């Protein structure tokens, strides 16, 4: 029962860090004046009037490459600490890391075979 007191600081920090943003949104909602007008409905581009159509479409290919990059970048972030302590951890962690690397590679090969990475 006395072990629960070890987490009191964690729970206090979690509650306070949850209350502060909620309180900030509530205060800004109460104090903000509500004004309707043409300025509120116009597009904003770095303080100048937008030229041409403000709505641009991007090809989905950009997002596919960005998603593949993010997946392998996050994988690299997780593999770096493993590589630094490889000699201490042993063969079982090597097998787990191999599976961890194999899953995104299988997904990449599948996307490649389906033509998701073709630019044209």
Curated annotation (Swiss-Prot):
Keyword Transmembrane attributed: yes
Keywords: Chloroplast, Membrane, NAD, NADP, Plastid, Plastoquinone, Quinone, Thylakoid, Translocase, Transmembrane, Transmembrane helix, Transport
UniProt cross-references to InterPro entries, sorted A to Z: NAD(P)H_OxRDtase_bac/plastid (IPR023043), NADH_UbQ/plastoQ_OxRdtase_su3 (IPR000440), NDAH_ubi_oxred_su3_sf (IPR038430)
Keyword Translocase: yes
Signal peptide annotation: none
Entry membrane topology: Multi-pass membrane protein
E.C. number(s) listed in UniProt: 7.1.1.-
Membrane-spanning parts: 9-29, 64-84, 88-108
Location relative to the cell: Plastid, Chloroplast thylakoid membrane
Molecular function in Gene Ontology: NADH dehydrogenase (ubiquinone) activity; quinone binding
EC top class named in words: translocase
Quaternary assembly: NDH is composed of at least 16 different subunits, 5 of which are encoded in the nucleus.
Family: Belongs to the complex I subunit 3 family.
Function: NDH shuttles electrons from NAD(P)H:plastoquinone, via FMN and iron-sulfur (Fe-S) centers, to quinones in the photosynthetic chain and possibly in a chloroplast respiratory chain. The immediate electron acceptor for the enzyme in this species is believed to be plastoquinone. Couples the redox reaction to proton translocation, and thus conserves the redox energy in a proton gradient.
Protein name from the UniProt record: NAD(P)H-quinone oxidoreductase subunit 3, chloroplastic
Organism the protein comes from: Dioscorea elephantipes (Elephant's foot yam)
Phylogenetic classification of the source organism: Eukaryota, Viridiplantae, Streptophyta, Embryophyta, Tracheophyta
């Amino acid at each position: 029962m006395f072990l629960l007191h070890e987490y009191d600081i964690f729970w206090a920090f979690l509650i306070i860090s949850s209350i502060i943003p909620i309180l900030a949104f509530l205060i800004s909602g109460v104090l903000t004046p509500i004004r309707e007008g043409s300025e509120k409905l116009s597009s904003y581009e770095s303080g100048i009037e937008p030229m041409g159509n403000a709505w641009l479409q991007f090809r989905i290919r950009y997002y596919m490459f960005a998603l593949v990059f993010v997946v392998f970048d996050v994988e690299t972030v997780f593999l770096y600490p493993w590589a630094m302590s490889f000699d201490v951890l042993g063969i079982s962690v090597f097998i787990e890391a191999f599976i961890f690397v194999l899953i995104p590679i299988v997904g990449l090969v599948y996307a490649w075979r389906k033509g998701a990475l073709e630019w044209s």
